[in-house]
Amino acid sequence: MRDLILFLSLLHTIFASLFSLKPPSQDDFYKAPAGFKAAKPGDILKTRKSPNKPSSLYAPVDVQNSWQLLVRSEDSFGNPNAFVTTIIQPKNADPSKVVSYQNWEDASNINCSPSYGSQLGAPLSTILTQLDMTFIVPPLKSGYYVVLPDYEGPKSTFGVGRQSGKATLDSIKAVLKTKDFSGINDDAKVVLWGYSGGSFASGWAAVLQPEYAPELKDNLIGAALGGFAANLTGIAESVDGEVFSGFIPLALNGIANEYPDFKKRLYEEVKPGAKADLQKGAENCLAASLISYPMYQYFTGPRRVFEKGWSLLEDKTIGKTLEDNLLIALSKEHMPQIPIFVYHGTIDKIIPIKDSIKIYKNWCDWGIGSFEFSEDKSNGHTTETVVGAPAALTWIDARFAGKPAVEGCSFTTRASNFLYPNISESAASYFKGIYQTILRSKLGSGVTSDDVSVNGLRSLYHT
């Protein structure tokens, strides 16, 4: 593992020196032009070739082309805004197939945006975006265009459902208008895919589509959701005081970026000595927060950040704001109209599987057309990221091939999602290689703990 870390650090140093990048906070391309409010959601405000090639683990990804669009959208309250989305064209591009891949950005700082962290020359602060980029290589090799929306928008609203869902949908609307330079057909089929924080944005896009983007009805053909983040408060309960407690300040500040009243109440309730640490959540990207705040107690224990503990969620402003951003709390009217595939590890200690199962039961009881759930008995959150990916790709391939999705609901428990039917040999080999390289283990050797990536990241930052 140390050899890998040293190698990645060397790659980063080399490419960072060769390919300079302006962070979004200093890049005028990210700023909406005068009069942009008159445009419609999904309209393209600006277009450019991506400043640098896309990269995965700080090595260039071999693609035909890459563009960035500034897209008109709106926030949770319908106020106009604009965000950047990235289109990646593979060498053997099929103009009829697009994967909208929602990265696990999980941060409340615009300089953590996927459009920035996915390129050569990106800083070490975005290393988890570079890791996440390994998952788009197989779809690109299959000839699928890949789209990476900065779905958190210009305010970096991590944990805000409607902003994330609307931006994801407006990104697709915009991409389908780019045939003149990207080659993508305006009637192309699109599949949503995301893991963890990416599943949050993808899930919200799926539930909002019938009302917010009915024009995409014939384009969207499914959503693959891994480590499905259906309940933010359930995640907070799971990670508070544990290895991945660094998620909490990122989400709280992301929500605060969208809801001023929530922010005011939140910071009124912070213990004076803990305010600076909470504010760091508005500055850090995901990796830095995870390695800086493991085992941190926000709602439990004698040294908790909030004196009121979990009773803080009973506050009218805080409680209602959080509930408004829970997929699991939505009514029948927000049930997806597209096929859904969820893959989730039984022993996930970050996003408890029980909430994914609850939303499965809700949507099935309400008569969803197609929902396939694949539970992995052997893996937690970090390892299922890799182990479940070939299953997701197999499901996505089937949608693009025009094969029928399951009718109604299907729940299957497997020893491992590597055993999902019809996984291609190339996909299995690719992801087994990632598993063994990144997680420093062979499959089946018992590496299922959700602390492996934190240890690796800490080693990287202290190399």
From Swiss-Prot:
Keywords: Disulfide bond, Glycoprotein, Hydrolase, Lipid degradation, Lipid metabolism, Secreted, Signal, Virulence. Glycans are attached at residues 231, 422. The active site is at residues 196, 348, 381. The keyword Signal applies. SUPFAM superfamilies: alpha/beta-Hydrolases. It comes from the Eukaryota. The keyword Lipid metabolism applies. Coiled coil: none annotated. Its EC number is 3.1.1.3. InterPro entries: AB_hydrolase_fold, Lipase_secreted. Secreted lipase that is able to hydrolyze both the neutral triacylglycerols and the monopalmitate ester Tween 40, allowing the use of hydrolyzed products as carbon sources. Has broad lipolytic activity, which may be important for colonization and subsequent infection, therefore contributing to the persistence and virulence in human tissue. This is Lipase 6. It comes from Candida albicans (strain SC5314 / ATCC MYA-2876) (Yeast).
